[in-house]
Design a protein with these regions (language model features):
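NAD(P)+-binding Rossmann beta1-loop-alpha1 motif at the extreme N-terminus of oxidoreductases
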Residues: 1-53
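Rossmann-like NAD(P)(H) cofactor-binding subdomain of soluble oxidoreductases
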Residues: 55-142
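Helix-loop-beta segment of a Rossmann-like dinucleotide-binding subdomain
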Residues: 142-157, 208-221, 276-287
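Active-site-proximal catalytic alpha-helix in oxidoreductases
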Residues: 188-219, 225-239
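NAD(P)-dependent Rossmann-like dehydrogenase/reductase catalytic/cofactor-binding core
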Residues: 232, 236-325
């Protein structure tokens, strides 16, 4: 496939690297004023979970090719802080054409998203990967390092339920990279649920340690049953906020059972999972985009307040988190 990655962020670069390794043609679109536009190559350190549950540490180089045309088979969009409307404005201004794969945190309903995407065929996904980019000390770097991890699956809407013509090709793209597809009942609901759970994790870690050093905050959280028990209690509150959007949580009980056990018992299971699962632990350590972490918390917080949902522990932790910024 001919693939355009919007930007040069962690998620786009990670999957772009994998797509290129699998033989696809991958280009990146960067604004003229972007400080990343001079980057010609990424040094990649990847904890690869596609063939091993523990992950295999690999090293590689990713040569960056900038966009050279307007028509692509797939346009891969992963943007932080929910700035999808700004990205769509740029896509329209550049007159890019192709199926859009939108894979980022979004706190929107389907009607709003459809209006935003008007004129384009799109499909929603969500990456199961994470990492960080390091540019060194240059103001206009020519090289950078990508430190990332990737799991063996990717969340994707059922291609038969969306109006794209090349759904089979999109599925085959991931298959060519040895990545399995998981297809939730409703991708919008799945993303909202994912953000609600993450908001609980972020606020507990941030209130305890601050998130300016997100790796330290993650370490402390993963090693503490006390903090993990707080996460469980707050997830119960943020799930009520998700339900206030009209999402039927009863349909998701099989995925949420852990949060309905006694909090200390759930915390024990979570701590054991972090201790045993190298990939999960690593993705927690690497997620350091503070603005995006705050965006997740604020989306859930604002929805709860607007809908008058009682979530006292969550609201208090958000205030403590902001006080430590």
């Amino acid at each position: 496939m001919n693939i355009l990655i919007i930007g040069l962020g962690v998620i786009g670069s990670t999957y772009g690297f994998l797509f290129k390794q699998a033989g696809h043609h991958v280009e990146h679109y960067l604004r003229n004023e972007s400080h990343k536009k001079g980057i010609k190559q990424l040094s990649v350190s990847l904890l690869d979970g596609r063939k091993s549950a523990e992950g295999i540490q690999t090293e590689g180089q990713y040569d960056i090719t900038l966009c050279s045309k307007k028509r692509y088979d797939l346009i891969f969009v992963s943007v932080a802080q929910g700035k999808i409307s700004l990205v769509m404005q740029e896509i329209r201004e550049e007159q890019f054409d192709g199926t859009l794969l939108i894979c980022c945190n979004l706190w929107l309903d389907r009607a709003t998203l459809d209006r935003m995407m008007q004129g384009y065929h799109y499909i929603l996904g969500f990456p199961v990967a994470g990492g960080r980019l390091e540019y060194g000390g240059d103001s206009i770097p020519s090289q950078a390092k990508l430190d990332a991890c990737v799991f063996d699956h990717f969340m994707l809407e059922n291609v038969s339920s969306v109006g794209i013509t090349n759904g089979t090709d999109v599925c085959q793209l991931f298959a060519s990279c040895n990545i399995q597809l998981e297809q939730p009942h409703d991708m919008i609901e799945w993303i909202a649920l994912h953000m609600a759970i993450n908001a609980a994790v972020i606020t507990v870690a941030g209130a305890a340690t601050g998130i300016n050093d997100s790796a330290q905050a993650a370490h402390r959280l993963m090693n503490s049953t006390t903090l993990l028990a707080e996460v469980i209690k707050i997830v119960r509150e943020t799930l009520k906020i998700v339900a206030s959007r009209g999402i039927n949580l009863k349909l998701l009980r099989d995925k949420l059972w852990l949060f309905y056990l006694p909090a200390r018992l759930s915390a024990y299971f979570m701590k054991r999972m972090f201790a045993r699962n190298n990939l999960t632990r690593r993705i927690m350590e690497l997620h350091g985009n503070i603005e995006d972490l705050l965006y997740i918390c604020e989306c859930v917080y604002n929805e709860g307040k607007s809908n008058h949902i009682s979530a006292p522990i969550f609201y208090r932790k958000v205030a403590l988190l902001k006080a430590k910024l």
